[in-house]
Amino acid sequence: MDIIHHFHNGQTIFDIMMTRIINNRNFQRMIDLEAPHTKQCYFTILNEQETISNVPVGTGLCVFTYHPQNRISFDELNRIFKYTNDGVYLRQVFLPTHIPRHYKCRINDQQYTNMVILGKRYDLRKSETYIELIQLGLDVISDVNVIYWTSKQNYIDATKYLISIGANIKTAIYSASKFGNLDLIISIIDGKNKDIILTAVKCMIADYHLDLAKEMISIYSELLGTEVVELTTYLESNSKLVKSTKSTKSSGSPKSIKPKKSNQNNNAKINVSQNDNSTICFDKKVQQNEITVDKMSSAKEQALNVYKEIENMENFILNKINITKKKALDKIKEIENIENTVVEKLEDKITKSNVSITNTDTITQAIISENLNSLDLLIRQGYDINKILYLACINNKKNVIDYLIDNKGANYEQVHKQLLDSKHHYKNDSTVKYLAKIIMTKSQFENVTDTDEIQQVSKKHYFKEPIHIPLGLGKDDDLSPIMVACRASKNDDQLDLVKMLVSYGFNINSRDKIGRSALHYAVNGSNRKIIEYLLALGADYSFRDNNGDTPMMLAKKSNNLELLDLFQSVPKDTKTIEPKKVTNTTDKTNLNQDIKTAMSICLSSINDNQFESVQKLIMSGFNVSSKDDTKKTLLHMAVVNNNLRIVELLINSGININSQDNLGKTPLMLACQYSHRDSKLAIVEFLLNNNAKILIKAKNNMTAIDLMSKTYNNNIYNLLCERLSINH
């Protein structure tokens, strides 16, 4: 049964269904959040009440009935003024996709649709609106439709602005005269330009605004010169025509008689230049007052044909939707049947064996097919969940990995370590890295106490470069964080930082490219307490730098007797070590490990929400903008871990807020992607307030708002839409 053709109280059954659906708030919210829409922006022009077919519309998704009379016209910015007669507000239009019964069509070169997402609103009466539209690509100079439209609407300020930037004033005069907007003509004409005055007078005579035309001829007679005679003749001819028409109407004749013009002016034409390339020829004739029956019949027949064409199109689309829906339902049932069969067989096998499952092939089959129901059953029967996670990793099934970690509490750290030591490490390198990223976001260094264990991730090359390198020092300086702290310290003010760095396992005997150690830099800064601390830890004060100086020699050169006494109090049982290059040496390795360890410290501090630790590391001169192996910055990590204070600290320290990782994702995208886990509204709002860009695309061609639509966080979604509307 075709529901479109069965009417009830003036409505089709489908109209009634759509009304009920639209009134359902849950369904409306689902559409707003879930319905993808085209990224291409169109426009439409609405009246002052913003109604379509007497139905109010507003920002967001607007759904009309499928009846062809209830539709909205839209088009590109440079075409919309050509096809729209009247209006006050220009609206952004986006087309929803993947929504059943959405359609669009083109009739007489105009585009129509029954569903739109309305965006930003522009007031076409204001001149500043056109400044924005020109920035969006509106051509107001070569396209005369814009100036013609504003003059027709009698928008004086807008028309004057367009003329001031080069729009065609003659087109404005013609349009204003045609639609009787005489005050607009008076406000835009230039009293010193003969060509403009001549155009205005001819247009007003042609459109029978005879009183104003006569007044203008009188005022500008000196400027018009010899043209006055021709204009006066044209004016008198049209005056007689008007009087003749009035006389005919007053005689009570049942039919109006077409007034006759003199031969001289019957086909009077006014030529108006358009951008030196085209000419508008206005042939003004008196219109017939009646339309013949034949023309009315023809128009009616045309309208019926259009209606039938749309009706056929509607039926075709409905059939397609029904066929596609049926195929999808059949496929879902088929998959459910297969899944139930597998689960039943597995349960039967478990029941018969009555023992714990040890068949790895069965587990692998469930993992490869990503059958989470089967895996749940296996776990309930006592199968080792960490072994399932291990098998999921070597089979590169990331959906299963996420499910086991997020929902079943699998020990991902244990499995990660097992993978690093196994033969599968290089074969499944991408999965191992994926697990490492999960460890980073879940405080992977939280229980680590051994420096070698901290550095293990760096040795596996998950991070190509250190996240923190001293600022103000080039890469060639090769200074470790402890060296930086000692060099920057004055009166031992960095002692606490040095102690913290030592506690994290930095090598106090590392040497830079000029052969100096942390002790050399501490002596240069006369930091007695730091020197005492380093010597107590066994720092080697016998190292010579490239100039042949030991730390003690530097103290002697500076005549610092207090430091000399300090060095002389240390037992002299060590041999002076000559200077050496650090390239390809153990010191170079230690230095690189120290710098990589700095990255681990920062990540650990973020994961543990240790604001003060991150602050101290940044104050010591670490570069906040470097990236790890996945091209993530500290800001990415702080956003994922929902640390607002650390996010604020990093942004205020100059980190790139729109930096993209190897998947093309920005910190804003990650905040949107993980917003279902905990509320990240404050972080999203802070990022947006600091110029985070919404429309940057990741490598999968998705933006932050696309990722947001999958998490059902309505507050963040509305915030993104609001900012997007303001910025565009």
From Swiss-Prot:
PROSITE patterns: ANK_REP_REGION, ANK_REPEAT
Alphabetical UniProt keywords: ANK repeat, Coiled coil, Repeat
UniProt xrefs under Gene3D superfamilies: Ankyrin repeat-containing domain
InterPro entries: Ankyrin_rpt (IPR002110), Ankyrin_rpt-contain_sf (IPR036770), Multifunctional_ANK_Repeat (IPR051165)
Pfam families assigned to the protein according to its UniProt record, in alphabetical order: Ank_2
SUPFAM superfamilies noted in UniProt: Ankyrin repeat
Coiled coil feature spans: 292-338
Domain of life: Viruses
ANK-type repeats, residues: 142-171, 173-198, 358-383, 384-414, 477-510, 514-543, 547-576, 594-626, 630-659, 663-696
Keyword Coiled coil: yes
Positions with biased composition (Low complexity): 244-267
Residues covered by region (Disordered): 244-271
Position of the signal peptide: none
Family matches, as PANTHER family: ANKYRIN REPEAT-CONTAINING, PROTEIN HOS4
UniProt protein name: Putative ankyrin repeat protein L271
Native source organism of the sequence: Acanthamoeba polyphaga mimivirus
Lineage: Viruses, Varidnaviria, Bamfordvirae, Nucleocytoviricota, Megaviricetes
